[in-house]
């Protein structure tokens, strides 16, 4: 099957370079019905609305072809092939999940530039010179979270992780960086599963902190179960937890977030105000990163046009002077596609908001 697929990719790429359409078009893929996916989509849509309200890109409307990959690798690969073969699409915003981006990257390689929004797996580092991301890798984030847990004064920690690219990578980085005793490491089901036995077991291990490498859905369920069993320890999650703020049981939990709405920088506050006005809610890191990726691609196309190779080359060649200055910070890329200098903000859930946390 390898030869026919490669032939299709080459054919699709050749067609895509044949000439521009009347509009400039971006592809986007993610699990739009999930909480974090919906936030990604809102960030993308807001960016496009603002761009089109300001003469579009090169005086032409910026359009979006969005596809729902359901956080499924096979669907993501099929969507990637569709995007590659569509001559109107100049670049892709997404994918959102690590596993779907890994699957899609093999299709985009050599054919279509893509900027992952919230895909953090170390497996993406260097996967293709056509794939970039605007969020730090788990290998960097997990180290920061492990060190933060130690700064909180904890010497005993437990780890729960979703058994996928994201969960495994983040959990391993935390484990390696936590300068204390790891009392247990356990894989957990994704989604709104039954976490009663996990919390019951953790209570027998007496950790001071539980690190959870998973998404907001499993995170909220775990925190509810911990409250139910009166298991009062510190909980810490990665960027997958940025959407847990509305859960009452999340009060006091720590989150390694790529962005917080309390960021006082002018560009960040402009984005927060615009997002609240448009959607009636506070944006999280998912929305901010997707917004930045979309605005960044629009700026690149404004500079070099809709040609795919020109876009890829411009992204790869960004230096400190030409770096994109977005709501999540300054963005340029290492040769392996990871962002330069991107870090996480350690925040704490406080009455439905994320506020920057300090060590105690």
Predicted regions and their residues:
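Extracytosolic ligand-binding ectodomains
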Residues: 2-13, 17-360
């Amino acid at each position: 099957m390898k030869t026919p697929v490669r032939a299709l990719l080459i054919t699709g790429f050749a067609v895509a370079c044949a000439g521009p359409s009347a509009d400039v078009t971006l592809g986007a893929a993610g699990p739009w019905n999930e909480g974090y996916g919906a936030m990604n989509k809102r960030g993308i849509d807001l960016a496009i609305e603002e761009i089109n309200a300001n003469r579009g890109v090169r005086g032409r409307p910026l359009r979006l072809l969005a596809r729902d990959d359901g956080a499924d690798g096979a669907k993501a690969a099929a969507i990637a092939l569709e995007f590659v073969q569509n001559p109107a699409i100049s670049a892709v915003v997404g994918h959102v999940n690590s596993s779907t981006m890994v699957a899609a990257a093999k299709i985009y390689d050599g054919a279509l530039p893509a900027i992952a929004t919230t895909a953090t797996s170390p497996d993406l580092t260097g996967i293709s010179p056509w794939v970039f991301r605007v969020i730090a890798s788990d290998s960097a984030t997990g180290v920061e979270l492990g060190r933060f847990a130690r700064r909180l004064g904890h010497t005993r920690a437990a780890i729960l992780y979703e058994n996928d690219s994201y969960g495994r990578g983040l959990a391993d980085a935390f484990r390696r960086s936590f300068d204390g005793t790891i009392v247990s490491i356990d894989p957990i089901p994704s989604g709104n599963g039954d976490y009663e036995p996990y919390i019951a077991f953790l209570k027998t291990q007496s950790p001071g902190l539980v690190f959870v490498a998973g998404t907001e859905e499993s995170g909220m369920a775990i925190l509810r179960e911990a409250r139910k069993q009166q298991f009062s320890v510190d909980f810490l999650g990665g960027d997958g937890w940025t959407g847990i703020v509305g859960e009452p049981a999340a009060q006091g939990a720590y989150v390694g977030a790529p962005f917080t709405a309390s960021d006082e920088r002018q560009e960040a506050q402009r984005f927060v105000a615009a997002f609240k006005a448009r959607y009636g809610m506070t944006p999280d890191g998912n929305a901010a990163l997707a917004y930045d990726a979309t605005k960044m691609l629009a700026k690149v196309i404004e500079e070099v046009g809709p040609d795919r190779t020109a876009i890829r080359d411009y992204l790869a060649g960004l230096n400190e002077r030409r770096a994109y200055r977005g709501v999540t910070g300054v963005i340029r890329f290492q040769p392996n596609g990871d962002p330069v200098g991107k870090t996480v903000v350690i925040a704490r859930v406080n009455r439905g908001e994320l506020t920057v946390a300090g060590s105690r």
